[in-house]
UniProtKB/Swiss-Prot annotation:
Family membership: Belongs to the ATPase alpha/beta chains family.
Molecular-function annotations in GO: ADP binding; ATP binding; proton-transporting ATP synthase activity, rotational mechanism
Record's catalysed reaction(s): ATP + H2O + 4 H(+)(in) = ADP + phosphate + 5 H(+)(out)
Enzyme class: translocase
Taxonomic path: Bacteria, Bacillati, Actinomycetota, Actinomycetes, Acidothermales
Species: Acidothermus cellulolyticus (strain ATCC 43068 / DSM 8971 / 11B)
Keyword annotations: ATP synthesis, ATP-binding, Cell membrane, CF(1), Hydrogen ion transport, Ion transport, Membrane, Nucleotide-binding, Translocase, Transport
Residue sites binding ATP per the record: G173, D174, R175, Q176, T177, G178, K179, T180
NCBIfam families (UniProt xref): atpA (TIGR00962), PRK13343.1 (NF009884)
Record's protein name: ATP synthase subunit alpha
Site (Required for activity): S374
Length: 554
């Protein structure tokens, strides 16, 4: 009888062949788990040992759950939908799929929930594919510096805290200070680019509503429809009535939809309104899952919650198609406290912040942007050269005006230079005011700010500044339209444009009537009072008589 020999090489080859040809099949060995505890949107499930992190689970009634906690003996899952019908003892099955959402151009003009299902009653959405919610952000080599401007249409932002495509710019402030209005204005301002039909100019927009009132979301949708902006916008809605799981997932759903366009070489803008409520929803989920609480009862990974979300906004390299995803996260503060936990986290992640102040808002300065602490760290590289030329001293002038204004409040006597600076500062503040949902094209912003920063408005009463600006822009549009065309064509204020502007504003002042009936171009002599009249009597000039001389006979 021959001796049986086992060769290690043969065993190794057989194992390698088996491993290389093995494909896991969920259907062939279906795992079934059971609910051991359910309540408050959370379910604990025993069994299902092969479950993946962030895998979708299906309960008996068809409701989906998301596996978040993978413990030795049980799974902690957040229920994505109504949880009243889920009870202890019910069976749970794996789907074998990580959470993903449908994406594509079919989402433009639609309102969807965080799972990509339509909420607007307009029928099913035809998707181009699916994209995982948890996806790795672009690496360093896949990015390039921000260099293209994204115009918001708001003068104070485009001039002093410019935003570029691929940037993350935080909008922060107390409630009712106009944070959402700034974001909606930015979306509305993309309409001209959309109507151009040029894919290099077009920006597709996503508005993510997290924990907002249903009436607020409806008002935003109505404003976008009225402005003709809904056709290039998607709304991802997770209202206050939704479970915490939906509020936690909504920003990732919006990012997945936006990243689909970014990786196709297109440009997208996403608004997260607001991430404070997402952090609160994640805190509720984490506490219910019995994760250890940290500062302000938030879990230890709340920074990672926002960093991995906002890092997905990027300007891709040319090799990757050159697409971009610009992020406008919104954070709500309490009592203007920007040093709280979540605000400081997001400030450190983003590329700058626009700080809106309650006092400015209540005093009628809208948008209520505090230019002193608002900053854009990278947007200046993408700013139009013409805007840089006119806005170079704007921030400094406004800062000096605020300082002088506080000093003048004590009733101190000011010299002529300080008074002139106060007068110009008041006109600049008035010039930067802007009605809601009325963004300005960049060429009109340049002309307005040129007039303010070069002293052309110094003789216009403060109460007439906004009317003067509106009428002057209309005058330039009708009589000197070549100025706007030249600014858009060259991107800068050339000497010819400046001379044309000086001529145009001099002509316009000849026709502009102030609120008190004066024409700026006509200088009237001041009327004299009675005391001056007495001293100004006209006297007839009598020349002195010459002395007479007698001739004597000689």
């Amino acid at each position: 009888m021959s001796e049986l020999t086992i060769r290690p090489e043969e065993i190794r080859a057989a194992l390698e062949e088996f491993v290389s040809s093995y494909t896991p099949d969920v259907a062939s060995r279906e795992e079934v788990g059971r609910v051991t505890e359910a309540g408050d949107g959370i379910a604990r499930i025993e069994g299902l040992p092969s479950t993946m992190a962030n895998e979708l689970l299906r309960f008996e009634d068809g409701t989906l759950g998301l596996a978040l906690n993978l413990d030795v003996r049980e799974i902690g899952a957040v229920i994505l939908g109504p949880f009243e019908g889920i009870e202890e003892g019910q069976t749970v099955k794996r789907t074998g799929e990580v959470l993903s959402v449908p994406v594509g151009d079919g989402f433009l003009g639609r309102v969807v929930d965080p799972l990509g299902r339509p909420l607007d009653g307009k029928g099913e959405i035809v998707a181009e594919g699916r994209r995982a919610l948890e996806i790795q952000a672009p690496s360093v080599v896949q990015r390039q510096p921000v260099k293209e401007p994204l115009q918001t249409g708001i003068k104070a932002i485009d001039a002093m805290t410019a935003i570029g495509r691929g940037q993350r710019e935080l909008i922060i402030g107390d409630r009712q200070t106009g944070k959402t209005a700034v974001a909606i204005d930015t979306i509305i301002n993309q309409r001209a680019n959309w109507e151009s039909g040029d894919p290099k100019l077009q920006v597709k927009c996503i508005y993510v509503a997290i924990g907002q009132k249903g009436s607020t979301i409806a008002a935003v949708r109505s404003a976008l429809e009225a402005a003709g902006a809904m056709e290039y916008t998607t709304i991802v809605a997770a209202p206050a009535s939704d479970p915490a799981g939906f509020k936690y997932l909504a920003p990732y759903t919006g990012s997945a939809i936006g990243q689909h366009w970014m990786y196709k070489g297109q440009h997208a803008l996403i608004v997260f309104d607001d991430l404070s409520k997402q952090a609160e929803a994640y805190r509720a989920i984490s506490l219910l899952l019995r994760r250890p609480p940290g500062r302000e009862a938030y879990p230890g990974d709340v920074f990672y919650l926002h960093s991995r979300l906002l890092e997905r906004c990027a300007k891709l390299s040319d090799a990757m198609g050159g697409g971009s995803l610009t992020g406008l996260p919104i954070i709500e503060t309490k009592g203007n406290d920007v040093s709280a936990y979540i605000p400081t986290n997001v400030i450190s992640i983003t590329d700058g912040q626009i700080f809106l102040e309650t006092d400015l808002f209540n005093s009628g300065v809208r948008p209520a942007i505090n230019v002193g602490i608002s900053v854009s760290r990278v947007g200046g590289n993408a700013q139009l050269k013409a805007m840089k030329q006119v806005a170079g001293r704007l921030r400094l002038d406004l800062a000096q005006y605020r300082e002088l204004e506080a000093f003048a409040a004590f009733g101190s006597d000011l010299d002529a230079a300080s008074r002139a600076q106060l007068e110009r500062g008041a006109r600049l503040v008035e010039l930067l005011k802007q009605p809601q949902y009325s963004p300005y094209p960049v060429e009109e912003q340049v002309v307005s700010l040129w007039a303010g920063t070069t002293g052309q408005l110094d003789d216009v009463p403060v109460t007439d500044i906004r009317r003067f600006e509106r009428d002057f822009l209309e005058y330039v549009r009708l009589r000197h339209h070549g100025i706007f065309d030249e600014i858009l064509k060259t991107g800068e204020l050339t000497d010819n444009v400046v001379e044309s502007l000086k001529l145009a504003i001099a002509e316009f002042k000849q026709t502009f009537e102030t609120h008190d009936g004066k024409i700026l171009g006509h200088e009237e002599a001041p009327q004299l009072d009675e005391s001056h009249l007495a001293a100004e009597k006209v006297r007839k000039h009598v020349p002195p008589s010459k002395p007479t001389t007698q001739r004597t006979a000689g």
